Design a protein with these regions (language model features):
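Short, acidic, small-residue-rich periplasmic hinge/interaction motif at the N-terminus
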Residues: 40, 52-56, 89-93, 107-147, ...
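Short, acidic Ser/Thr/Gly-rich low-complexity loop/linker segments typical of extracellular
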Residues: 59-73
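N-terminal periplasmic accessory domains that precede
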Residues: 108-113, 123, 127, 153-159, ...
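Periplasmic plug
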Residues: 172-213
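Outer-membrane beta-barrel translocator/receptor signature
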Residues: 220-227, 235-284, 310-313
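Transmembrane beta-strands of outer-membrane beta-barrel pores
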Residues: 244-248, 263, 274-278, 335-341, ...
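Face-selective signature of the C-terminal outer-membrane beta-barrel domain
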Residues: 312-340, 363-502, 506-512, 516-522, ...
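Outer-membrane beta-barrel signature, preferentially recognizing the C-terminal barrel domain
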Residues: 523, 533-582, 589-591, 611-625, ...
């Protein structure tokens, strides 16, 4: 009995000791360990810069992410989980995943070999550090130093622009162009507005896919190319960011509040944007000549101090649900509120023969509208090589527009327009990858209705209803033949434009072709061909006659035809170490360009007898020949970057009663310096770049600025001086070379001369950085069908 008692007591003691030991094993903290390694391409015997390294606890929980440095090495510290997986991936290469169990000591992974994807091997050419050229785009992988130097996504683009041929950025005006046109912005392949890009956490940007070739899918947006931000892998958490840009010397403010949260399979985000401007020193000088009467009417306009006020607000709510890695659903709701009021005062001297009349003119415009939109998107990966996407977008706009004029000689005119318009767009896109090429096929249908209710001087109201239907089918093939990458697209579009009583239908083919030839590691040659018919806006079809002033009226034209833009461009690109240079020449022709023609109404039976009619017509052709050279250096002594751009353009414009030729030079220089937490920047437009539209020649905005920024933990502070050492601020010039009403105008805002602006930004991250699933959503530009600028 005593033996059994002692035996049971000993067994009980062993059980208790085992339980205590097991408890200590589970509840004592595990020592944190580090992970390091090096990623290389064994086929090319070179390190892979910017490879993505993700440490996961399980299939959905991400612990940490990083990228390889200039030597292909990476290091991740303070991992406490014993069971982990490490996924390593790189653009154009087969990724690998390694698993570790029960680990508590440092892991040296040594050299990891990534092999190129078979179908992408021939398409990829490394043309510089962190720059990969594919058949249809450049892939830029920002370094940790480049990301830490800047405070926002637009600033990051400005830092990397040397690697993106054709890209122009004005941080002061927040404008971005590619070859003179606004690009399509995307986040993980999803088309987004610029405001959404401005709200990105730039530290979460994994790479930027840049194309200076308009994508056939978005070619009708009038874009110069595509900028696609690929974000890092999502983890639970998010961030809140607030920034404000306040002018000290005048009344201007631009602010943004952004919040995003990711958990498990869902992501919620909200963004609020507001812009408020009140300028009190706006000037518009203009000289006009009206030819057609017995004597020419010569009008000289001297701008007096005038005001312009605008207040814009927008709220964007979005939700993304990832059912599994191959299935995604997204919904977003956007609301825009716009208010603008201009009051322009001028001193007029008007001469007709020997008669001279002097008077003051008060010209005013008011516009306000509300525009909500709903965007639904679904994507499904049918297999490893096939995906299908469905997208529906609806937008509605309701607003009032007023345009009026008061003269000291008692002439008064006021036009009022109430606009109600809506648009629905539906699209399906199918993508398939093959061994040596990739394809995508799409179909898009858009229906738009615009109803305008017009009244002049509180008189009888006239209703004009306009309709537009588009059916678009397209296909794109990308691949490579040895060192020659290619992307070829072909589309067909049917246009239908209609009023309440008439309609016209057109069918036009569209095509783009891009060829990239890699001439070694540092040189590449690119050729672009575009053939792009485009439909006029709805306002161009309106036959309602509206009064401009006491001697002129304006109207649209339901019979105008689509314009056709044909472009050829040859680009030579050089990248080596810190130096980037490009030389390009282009020649473009627009047939049937839209032109605002003037004619004098001499028919005594016409209700507009004795007036000058401004009407939308088709001209014969516009031609533009351009040569441009760009050179820059980045990270000079690790503290300085600069870029110089210069070019020459020759424009030729021809119509039924006009033919003109104009040549213009342009040049600009930008500088960026950085030291520790400080950065300095400057942009100088030596000569503006010009553009044409019909018989009108426009100068680009000559806008110079310089400033400094300081980064402190989650805070960023900036101070900028715009248009220094000037009295008139920025200047925009326009010239109409019409044979009936030639004119020259000069517009400037003196409030923006020597303008000082303070910027403050605060970013509060919680959890880890996040990323949306890869998707391609097209939200077509909305055309309200109203024109208040005539």
């Amino acid at each position: 009995m005593e033996y059994h008692y002692l035996l049971n007591k000993r067994i009980s003691f062993v059980k208790q000791a085992f339980i205590v030991g097991l408890s200590l094993f589970f509840f004592l903290p595990i020592k944190a360990y580090h992970i390091r390694g090096k990623v290389v391409d064994p086929t090319q015997k070179q390190t892979l810069i910017g490879a993505n390294v993700v440490v996961k606890k399980d299939s959905t929980t991400i612990l940490k992410t990083t990228q390889t440095d200039e030597n292909g090495c990476f290091s991740i510290k303070d991992i406490a989980e014993p069971n982990i997986s490490i996924a390593i991936s790189y653009f154009g290469y087969k990724g690998i995943t390694l698993h570790y169990y029960g680990n508590s000591s440092d892991i040296d992974m040594g050299t990891i070999h990534l092999l190129p994807e078979t179908q992408q091997l021939k398409e990829v050419t490394v043309i510089g550090k962190r720059v990969i050229q594919k058949a249809d785009k450049y892939v830029i992988i920002p370094s940790e130093e480049e990301i830490n130097r800047v405070s926002a996504s637009i600033s990051l683009l400005n830092e990397l622009k040397l690697k993106m041929p054709g890209l122009r950025i004005n941080e002061a005006l927040q404008t971005i162009t590619i070859d003179g046109s606004a690009p399509v912005f995307m986040i993980n392949g999803k088309k987004q507005p610029l405001s959404k890009v401005q709200g990105l956490n730039h530290q979460d940007i994994l790479r930027i896919e840049y194309s200076n070739t308009p994508d056939l899918r978005h070619i009708d947006d009038g874009n110069g190319g595509v900028i696609n931000f690929i974000m890092k892998t999502p983890v639970q958490g998010g961030f809140i960011m607030a920034n404000t840009n306040q002018a000290i010397t005048t009344m201007r403010n631009r602010s943004q509040l952004t919040g995003s949260y990711f958990k498990k399979k869902s992501e919620w985000s909200i963004q609020y944007n507001t812009t408020w401007r009140n300028s009190k020193k706006v000037y518009d000088n203009k000289n006009e000549r009206f030819i057609g009467r017995e004597y020419d009417i010569i009008r000289r306009q001297e701008g007096l101090p005038s005001t312009t006020k605008d207040f814009d607000n927008s709220v964007l709510l979005s939700y993304t649900y990832m059912y599994d890695p191959s299935t995604m659903l997204m919904a977003s709701l956007d609301l825009k509120l716009h208010h603008k009021k201009d009051c322009e005062d001028n001193r007029i001297v008007e001469q007709y023969g020997s008669s001279v009349e002097r008077y003051t003119k008060n010209y005013y415009t008011n516009s306000h509208y509300t525009s909500p939109s709903l965007d639904l998107f679904f994507k499904k990966a049918l297999s490893k090589t096939q995906t299908i996407e469905l997208n529906s977008v609806g937008r509605w706009s309701n607003g009032d527009y007023t345009r009026g004029m008061r003269n000291s000689n008692l002439y008064h005119q006021e036009n009022n327009t109430h606009n109600n318009s809506w648009n629905m767009t539906h699209e399906v896109l199918y993508t398939q990858l093959f061994k040596t090429l990739s394809t995508k096929w799409g179909a898009n249908y858009s229906h738009q209705v615009a109803e305008n209710n017009y009244a002049e001087n509180s008189g009888k109201r006239v209703t004009d209803k306009l309709f537009k239907d588009d059916i678009y089918l397209y296909g794109v093939v990308s691949g490579a033949l040895k060192s020659l990458g290619y992307t070829v697209g072909l589309g067909g579009k049917m246009y239908r434009n209609a009023t309440a009583t008439r309609s016209k239908t057109f069918f036009r083919l569209k095509t783009t072709a891009t060829f990239n030839y890699a001439m070694g590691r540092n040189w590449s040659l690119n050729y672009l061909f575009m053939y792009n018919p485009s439909q006029p806006s709805l306002a161009n079809f309106s036959n309602v006659v509206q009064t401009i002033d006491r001697i002129s009226v304006q109207m649209g034209n339901v019979n105008v035809k689509p314009s056709v833009w044909t472009r050829n461009r040859l680009l030579l690109l050089f990248n080596k170490n810190h130096i980037s240079s490009s030389l390009q020449t282009s020649y473009s022709v627009t047939t049937n360009p839209l032109v605002n023609t003037y004619q004098y109404i001499s028919d005594a039976a016409s209700p507009y007898h004795g007036l000058f009619m401004k009407k939308t017509e088709n001209g014969k052709n516009d031609r533009h020949f351009n040569v441009e050279y760009s050179v820059g250096m980045q990270n000079i002594a690790q503290h300085l970057s600069f870029q110089l751009i210069t070019g020459w353009s020759r424009f030729s414009m021809e119509g039924s009663n006009y033919r003109h030729h104009v040549s213009k030079m342009y040049a600009s220089i930008s500088l960026n310096g950085y030291w520790k937490h400080w950065s300095a920047f400057a942009n100088i437009d030596l000569a503006p770049q010009y553009s044409i539209w019909g018989t009108n020649l426009y100068s680009g905005t000559k806008y110079n600025y310089m400033g400094v920024k300081y980064h402190l933990k989650n805070w960023d502070f900036g101070l900028r001086l715009d248009n220094p050492l000037t009295k008139r601020g920025f200047i925009q010039c326009a010239e109409n070379i019409s044979n009936v009403v030639p004119s020259h105008s000069e517009y400037y805002i003196s409030d923006m001369a020597n303008m000082v602006e303070l910027s403050i930004q605060y970013r509060l991250p919680f959890g880890k950085a996040y990323k949306k699933a890869n998707r391609t959503l097209r939200n077509k530009n909305f055309d309200a069908g109203v024109n208040n600028e005539y």
